[in-house]
């Protein structure tokens, strides 16, 4: 029993130390100047939203996959076709790069930032016809989001690209976001699908989106 307790103590201490190093690297890189890491969401008006320099990260650990975060921070590439909250400026992909160690440390720190609204949904990413029909026809998600079809990037420019969503997004977060996007982004053009789609349809759509390559 003592060995179990000691093992837990050392594991918890290591995890805490790792998170501490990640927070230090996060602060040293100046990430807090653009990214909110304490929830809940603060913007209340369009003016508030437009004042943001980058996406909030207070639920990063619920939204992203750690492997993606570490790789992206070391070699960042545009996720949004357009600059953050811009309809006219193309995203030039000028996000600062971190060293391999700092990227891993910051990714570990960000993965500890969880949103209680994101529950274990049990959803598995998968190609499914019902989800595809909702995405392509019923809601025309292509209008705002890019996807890759037969090796070609197609779709709208106003929202983040969903090409590569399978490597990037947690299906639990996708489901929570589709169900109640205002929790994460109070000022948003994204529809509240809880009043449009059934729970089963939201799950089908979340499984489909989180499987997009």
Write out the residue ranges for each language-model feature.
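Bacterial N-terminal signal peptides
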Residues: 2-12
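Sec/Tat signal peptide C-region and signal peptidase I cleavage site
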Residues: 11-19
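Sequence/structural segment immediately N-terminal to covalent heme-attachment motifs in c-type
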Residues: 18-40, 123-148
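Gly/Gly-Pro-rich "capping" loops immediately C-terminal to redox-active cysteine motifs
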Residues: 23-25, 36-71, 146-177
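Short, structured interface segments
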Residues: 33, 97-120
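Axial heme c-ligation environment in periplasmic c-type cytochrome domains
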Residues: 46-62, 74-104, 122, 155-163, ...
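Short, solvent-exposed mixed-charge patches
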Residues: 212-213
């Amino acid at each position: 029993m003592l060995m179990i307790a000691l093992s837990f103590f050392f594991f918890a201490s290591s995890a805490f130390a790792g998170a501490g190093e990640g927070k230090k690297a996060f602060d040293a890189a100046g990430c807090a100047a653009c990214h909110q890491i304490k929830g809940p969401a603060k913007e209340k008006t369009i003016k508030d939203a437009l004042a943001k320099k980058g996406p909030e990260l207070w639920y990063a650990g619920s939204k992203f996959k750690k492997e993606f975060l570490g790789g992206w921070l070391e070699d960042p590439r545009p996720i949004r076709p357009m600059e953050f909250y811009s309809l006219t400026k193309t995203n030039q992909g000028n996000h600062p790069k971190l060293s391999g160690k700092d990227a891993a440390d910051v990714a570990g720190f960000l993965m500890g930032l969880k949103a209680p609204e994101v529950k274990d949904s049990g959803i598995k990413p998968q190609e499914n016809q019902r989800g595809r029909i909702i995405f392509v026809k019923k809601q025309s998600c292509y209008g705002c989001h890019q996807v890759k079809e037969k090796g070609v990037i197609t779709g709208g420019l106003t929202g983040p690209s969903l090409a590569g969503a399978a490597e990037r997004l947690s299906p639990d977060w996708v489901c929570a976001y589709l169900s109640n996007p205002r929790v994460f982004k109070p000022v948003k053009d994204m529809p509240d699908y809880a009043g449009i789609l059934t729970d089963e349809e939201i799950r089908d759509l979340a499984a489909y989106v989180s499987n997009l390559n």
